[in-house]
Amino acid sequence: MSKKYPENSNQIARSRRDFMHQAGKVLGGGAVGLAAGQALALNEQSLVVPDHLDSITAPAVGGGAARDNLPYHDNVWNRDALARIMGDLDFGKQKFGWYRGVVKGIRAGEKVKDLVGFEGFSFTRLQDNGNGTYNKLLREVGFYTDLKTGEVLNEWHNPYTDETVPVVHIANDPFNFVISAFWPKPPSYGGLNTEKIPDIPMILDWTETPNGKVLLQNGIDLFYPSALQPDKWPRESSGKFSRVSEMFSYVFDRESLANPDHTGLEFSGSWHRVTPWLPWMLMGQSEGHVLYNCIQGCYKDMDMMSPKIRAYAEKHHAKFFEAPKKWEEPSWSSLEHYAVEQKPAPVKTSTK
């Protein structure tokens, strides 16, 4: 049986941010936010904390295909492997990450629509905390683009509402979290959850292939109080809670993964995100959602970045080509930035 706690609005507001930071600690903290080995179920009346916490904090190790000649079951090795994926263990050296794809609109009873392109990048730096953990310090930007030209959009025509709306891009400065040898623990939910959870070693989902590659998968399913509440943001908010899922895949050279001298790992992979309508689309609480369908990677140079994106970023966001050098606050998600930096759109008046 699940434990239920009465909802308190102030505690929920704190716990939403607490949870977002906890979730961001594993395989992510990206433009649009998250990837972690844990999930949270909430509803409007209560917080529901599952009893089987091991099922949300310890994903299964990649089955029989993962061989034992790399220490896949060693959580300290997994910590360092994750750090080499997310950054570079040559502390102080920054690492480039990139993603590109399409944002699709999904509604019942009709064909899925390609709405906008999406491309972004990040620079990350690691810090050794001296206690077995590492700080990941990140800046990143993500740009919504024209599907035909690849140009960065200033405004967008919404095919569902027949309305042209301003586009709000993603600029997270910073988005930081701590890499540990243990899975992040469920947050306190503003002090409502007092259950003591033991440390659970972090073992990632590795699979080896016959051609010298290693695959890694991870994902997260979230349901949490929205930073944009509909009473204040009637046109931007999808509702009191946000339901978000993210799915990540990574492909590495096994030889590189096995070599600790390769302090920062290159990889290619994919990233998918299922999320409510983006707030700047002004879809309100209408039925449907969006899907980000993207490829991703980390490489030694920025050649994968589209020339148009690089030129736009150099002109408007030059700061984002340099990772932070120290831990700074606040470390917000893109929706938290939206809530602080934007103003609610005027409510449409009826023409009848």
Question: Where does each model-flagged region fall?
Answer:
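Targeting-peptide/extracellular-domain and disordered-appendage signature
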Residues: A60-V61, A65, G117, A345-K352
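N-terminal targeting and processing segments
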Residues: G64-N131
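C-terminal segment of N-terminal export signals and the immediately downstream linker at the start
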Residues: A13-R14, L34-N75
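Edge beta-strand at a domain terminus
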Residues: S268-K352
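Sec-dependent signal peptide hydrophobic core
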Residues: A23-A31
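Predominantly extracellular/secreted and cell-surface proteins with exposed
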Residues: R107-F252
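Mature extracytoplasmic/lumenal regions of exported proteins
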Residues: S237-R273
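N-terminal secretory signal peptides
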Residues: M1-D18, Q22, L40-Q45
